[in-house]
Amino acid sequence: MLKVDKLSKEFKMHIRDGLVIEGFSDVTFTAYDGKLLAITGASGIGKSTLLKCIYRTYKPTEGSVVYSKMDGTDVNLVKADDQTILKLRKTEIGYISQFLSVIPRVSALDILTNRLSAKSSPETELRNMAEYYLNKVGISKTLWNMYPSTFSGGEKQRLNILLALAAKPKLLLLDEPTASLDIKSKEIIFELILDAKKSGTTMVGVFHDKDAIKALADGRFDMFENKLVAV
């Protein structure tokens, strides 16, 4: 479970004489295990900034983000030290951005096998699992040993989503995960996300895709004038 309480983010522009730009303010919501909470709203309103504050890419200005860990204890992600945040990102908290970011000159199969290594299974088993997942999302076998930089936009995004879901995070943050996918690819990703929900993963996602909201969301908030409103 994730409890966000009175969360705010401001950006202070030191090169602009201390100009303060509001990202969002006074955001409060609870996301439950096995549920997906959708965040909607106009572009540039602060939705992605909110996700980045939860993930701690940005440090919130005010408020708290209390996350219930796998071991049953709670941690305030706003106040947690960097070491704790990095450990949680590696083992429990996933983030799907709009762009694939991976180690260059490493094959898709090796990248996914490495991501699965947290399962502490034998190398052969991990590789078989990686092949299974790549096949499941419709990435051609001829691409498995290729660098993701050579993939099409849709193939990159399918791999991007797969890397996050295959690690089976307890909390998953999604920033427009289906933005560049065709209908068939969307259906595959919908299935993976629904499977993750069934396994208990808590999800908070930014969406513009109405089909995705209808298929996946258990609740929805709309961001308007930098504030979050239940829909």
Residue ranges: model-predicted function:
Residues Y55:
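Helix-to-loop junction immediately C-terminal to a conserved catalytic motif
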Residues Y147-F151, E155:
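Conserved ABC ATPase signature
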Residues L172-D175:
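Catalytic Walker B motif of ABC-type/P-loop ATPase nucleotide-binding domains
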Residues T124-T142:
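Conserved ABC ATPase "signature" region
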Residues T40-A42:
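The feature captures the beta-strand-to-loop junction immediately N-terminal to the Walker
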Residues A164-L165:
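ABC ATPase C-loop
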Residues S64-K87:
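ABC ATPase NBD Q-loop/coupling interface
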Residues F99, V106-S117:
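Q-loop/switch helix immediately C-terminal to the Walker
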